[in-house]
């Protein structure tokens, strides 16, 4: 009987941590950040003590017009998205961003660089919009299996990230389970 008791005591702390690894928002962060341990650790902190995380990142939240009156789920959603932006796994462009700014933001994404995806200015028309430019990238990167996806943050900006096409359905479902939205950037 002593064997089982000591084994249970050893497994106790691991079992307590397990739900944090299976939370839909952490799974989203894991996929988008390519399993980056530093980002996952920060995302866990955001979710474990949202109010403390909010206070530490007060300037970022206030820039988005958010306060502690917003729901914890919304604060966690935005906190994790800002974390991905800060670490260049996502980028944010205003709805009226010029082509040069869009191209710079997308080409600076870590996963675009990691996968050596080409971006040529000649593919785009400057008078078009971000959803149209993202549709062009989706077509150009189709053979490589990547698309431009986006987080809906209920604003007039686009928060985009490179997504393996085969992960998009899972990310969409995970976001929906939290009451939020991820979709192809061209659909935003």
Over which residues does each language-model region extend?
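Contiguous interface-forming segments/domains that mediate binding rather than catalysis
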Residues: 1-188
